[in-house]
């Protein structure tokens, strides 16, 4: 099975450093974000060994664009990543609890004290309720956690 998906992910940004609370060159907080994701996924055929072992698993590649509504202070990064997800529990005939993780690289940051480099690792993990009214359609909503990291390649690196 092959699929293409488009998703929007609104987010709150943790205020763990003064930079995010507005102590930046622009003087405005970085409190929220919105990202758009385009993903291509595939699943193994049900008749294959992997399809039999992992019948609800899917994997693929994705691209994302982020806005933090404060381009001058932090930039508007984009990410390229691989992802994998699967069902955790089937709740009803059409509703399930699923997970997904993403791992890749992000770029187009404006270097600053919080995000010290233009290129960073992108890590994401989430839980979703997925509603499948028809076999060809899937609607998901959930919560996830995203972390961008330069791996201490540039200091200071307050995250």
Segments (PLM) and residue ranges:
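Short loop/turn motifs that connect adjacent beta-strands in outer-membrane beta-barrel proteins
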Residues: 1, 45-57, 72-74, 89-97, ...
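Short glycine/proline- and aromatic-enriched beta-strand/turn motifs that initiate or cap beta-hairpins
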Residues: 1-31, 35-43
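Transmembrane beta-strands of outer-membrane beta-barrel proteins
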Residues: 2-6, 57-61, 80, 95-103, ...
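Residues on the lipid-exposed face of transmembrane beta-strands in outer-membrane beta-barrel proteins
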Residues: 6, 36-42, 82-88, 101-105, ...
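Transmembrane beta-strands of outer-membrane beta-barrel pores
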Residues: 8-14, 42-44, 63-69, 103-109, ...
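Outer-membrane beta-barrel translocator domains and adjoining extracellular loop/strand segments
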Residues: 16-23, 73-75, 110-114, 151-158
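Predominantly the C-terminal beta-signal and adjacent terminal strand-loop region
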Residues: 17, 128-159
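Residues that define the transmembrane beta-barrel architecture of outer-membrane proteins
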Residues: 30-36, 74-80, 117-123, 159
